[in-house]
Design a protein with these regions (language model features):
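Outer membrane beta-barrel transmembrane domains
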Residues: 4-5, 131-243
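Transmembrane beta-barrel domains of outer membrane proteins
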Residues: 26-28, 85-89, 125-129, 202-208, ...
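Transmembrane beta-strands of outer-membrane beta-barrel proteins
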Residues: 36-42, 82, 96-99, 103-111, ...
């Protein structure tokens, strides 16, 4: 993350420079209608996160301007976070039409706790398309479980190929956000005042061949802190393969 303006000195009332390099381990227990996901993420902020070098590489690759203020990034700190998510299959929205066209949906709630995020919320995703097969409408931009179907599906495929569109909406209440509030165990400046509630919605498209999927989407988030000029738009690009 970087502020909106480029400068070599700290810019208050804007997002601080911060990166977090993480490694996650996820347990997913599921049946045909419910699923529980528990993920542990360990990581580090500061120079060990490699955020500066990663951003400079991507900006150079695409011919974009560099941001010079990484000397002011939040200090290095070991991070640890637990993410719990409970999924519900919405069978009432599962419909099968002629020629292989289908709809499906899921809802979920989640609770996260640790040094990076302390928050809770819920959301819903809805899909419509051709030959959905044994894939799912899960399309989160956070966590590792978005790559795995959260339910045990037994749907028949009418072709090796499939395609779909999706829409998604979610809301969460945020008590702590390291990226806005600063590090927990090391002193860091307070740059912004965050909002306690954040909304998110998005849409996208997916293409499936047998057990592999390519997904692209755009997700929009309401302002996360009071001085933020506009909402965020995050692009999602995922390549999935189910074994």
């Amino acid at each position: 993350y970087t502020p909106e303006q480029k400068a070599t000195y700290p810019i208050y009332n804007q997002h601080p420079y911060v990166g977090n390099l993480t490694l996650g381990l996820t347990s997913l227990v599921k049946n045909e209608d419910r699923a529980n996901s528990l993920e542990l993420q360990l990581g580090t902020t500061g120079t060990n996160s490699l955020a500066k070098g990663s951003q400079h590489f991507i900006h150079k690759l695409w011919g974009m301007e560099q941001w010079p203020g990484w000397a002011n990034q939040l200090p290095g700190e070991i991070t640890a976070n637990l993410f719990f998510k409970r999924y519900y299959r919405l069978r009432g929205l599962e419909k099968r039409y002629g020629s292989g066209f289908e709809t499906d949906a899921l809802a979920y709630w989640h609770a996260d706790a640790g040094t990076v995020k302390v928050q809770a919320g819920g959301g819903m995703s809805f899909r419509f398309g051709y030959n959905l097969g044994n894939t799912s409408p899960e399309n989160s931009i956070r966590g590792a479980t978005s790559a795995a179907p959260p339910f045990v599906y037994n749907r028949m495929s009418v072709s090796n190929w499939g395609y779909y569109g999706y829409i998604h909406a979610a809301v969460r209440a945020v008590a702590h956000d390291l990226y806005l509030d600063g590090t927990v165990f090391r002193s860091s400046p307070k740059y912004v005042n965050k909002y306690p509630v954040v909304g998110e919605w998005g849409y996208g498209f997916g293409l499936r061949y047998k057990r592999s999927e390519l997904l692209f989407g755009l997700h929009y988030m309401t302002k996360e802190y009071t001085q933020q000029e506009s909402m965020q738009c995050v692009g999602v690009l995922q390549l999935r393969h189910t074994f």
